[in-house]
Amino acid sequence: MCETCKGNYYITTPIYYPSANLHIGHAYCTVATDAMARYKRLQGYNVKFLTGTDEHGQKIEDKAKEAGVTPQQFVDNIVLGEKGVLDLWKLMNISYDRFIRTTDDYHVAAIQKIFKKMYDNGDIYKGEYSGKYCKPCESFWTESQLVDGKCPDCGREVQDAKEEAYFFRLSKYADRIQDLLENTDFLEPRSRVNEMVNNFIKPGLEDLCVSRTSFTWGVPVDFDPGHVVYVWIDALFNYMTALGFENDKYNDLADFWPADVHFVGKEIVRFHSIIWPAMLMSLGLPLPKKVYGHGWLNFNGEKMSKSRGNVVDPYILSERFGVDALRFFLLRTFPFGSDGNFTNELLISTINTDLANDLGNLVSRTTAMSQKYFGGDLGVGGEHAPLDDELKALAEEVMANYEKQMDAFQFSVGLNEAFRLISRANKYIDETTPWILAKSEDTKPRLLTVMKNLCECIRIAAILVSPIMPDSAKAIFDLLGVPEEGRGWNARCYCADKDAVWKTSTGAPLFPRIDMEKELAALEELSKPASTIEIEPYAEEKVDFDTFCKSDFRAVKVKACVPVKKSDKLLQFTLDDGTGTDRQILSGIAKFYKPEELVGKTLVAITNLPPRKMMGRESCGMLLSAVHTEKGEEKLNLIMIDDAIPAGAKLC
């Protein structure tokens, strides 16, 4: 490490599951991580930025079988093939330093050693698993954890699972994990702490299944043939094996561990804030300094998923609008710790307003006036005015606020600060009226200072946006003729005095305005899904007539429907079932429907099921729905009947 470096900084994305090509939701986390890595490099840190792919598991094995290839061939195609993971990160200008695949030989060997160490110290033991299993999530659940009999994470069907397995004594570390979460800033945003403690730790942590025998595509447990290491150990330890833990592929573990921050989606916060630190505690290893759980990127108000056919292709958006514009939109528009609602209209509007009108227009006007009035040469001299001091003070305030917000991973707020300066510089043009100053030789010195101030504001703004829009920042520096030493973090001090000189040039608009109507039509055409729907064959199971007749099917009217707090899956229905007393049913269909679109609908419910507790609320019955598969992913539709049918009518 060089003497001028501030120190080492280790940042990671989650490793992505290559069961299909990645979409803009995956790019969101990776772009944010890249922006943070670039920001820290800009500040002078020696950065290690890790990303990669989590390539084992039953879902991969099954998908490979369907495709008629080996699991290794399947993941190789998704990761290395055309428009695969590596192509996507190249397209999005992701500056990762290391890419790990859990199928890499060094990682496989390291995982076997790690598993054996935890077995030898007594924290892994052999037993039998019996319960429910969600293949898409690769998660085990108890009956009480299911939502309407389905996976509480994704809402899909689960299957019975019973097999010999090894378990990790997660329960042993419950108190230490709770203390870590409640009394440190290990997990952010703070709202995630309450979710983890109240939903997982306080109800009681159960020991964790960490091996499987029902499939073979995984890291073999070398001392017990037939078992493969399950995802928790295999995937989570990538953050350390990629630095050389339990292998000799790399040797920078001592320099970069513990990680400064893991960026992860909120759906995997539980794994990173409970399971991961418990395993590190088991081995006596330092914990990462922070886990930051960002929100989801929704599309038109709905969670982005392949099953809905609403995933957004970053290749299409980058081709039409540019990579930097897309990166900017993702981090400018959505607070990083909260869910964001992606729409094409919002994307185009943001590009037109912030980039074309504000930043692009400021650069174009400034360089054009510099060329027109001074031939691009802003030499020594000038005339100061009090308005310049106001501009300088704002620039210094913006720089301080920007640094504070970026250090807190608040990219959107940091960019807001940069655009405060950009907006003020545009106003400064209107206040100083360079076109009037240019009419007289007597006011030429004042015009020179005005142009220098504008160039300085743009230069500082370019430094601030450079982690998010690296290519655009470089283009701006080039137009202003800024030397390399004026492009770094240490050059962000405001300097537009008489001794400052600039050699500017003009060029094509950095961010051309977009025709909203034309682009929306083009995007709609490009994103049309295939119309083919595949219906999964089912295994017929006979039920005798008397058993069927025991179920009481009734028409119910939806009086109210609201999301259940602290649950991404559940909707709470208030129903008129014809009895004169409202019936409450909870259903895990939040990813398929907006609550407001169900009010007033007539549905079908089984009303004689015993009440059950879900997220601390009582659910009295079950709503009927139809499930089908489209492009290999589940879709769900509630059974809706004629509104003329009265509440309480019996269906038979």
Which residue stretches match the model-derived regions?
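A glycine-rich helix N-cap at a beta->alpha junction
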Residues: 80-95
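Beta-strand segments within the central parallel beta-sheet cores of soluble alpha/beta enzyme folds
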Residues: 290-293, 477-479, 572
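Phosphate-backbone binding interfaces of nucleic-acid-interacting proteins
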Residues: 530-652
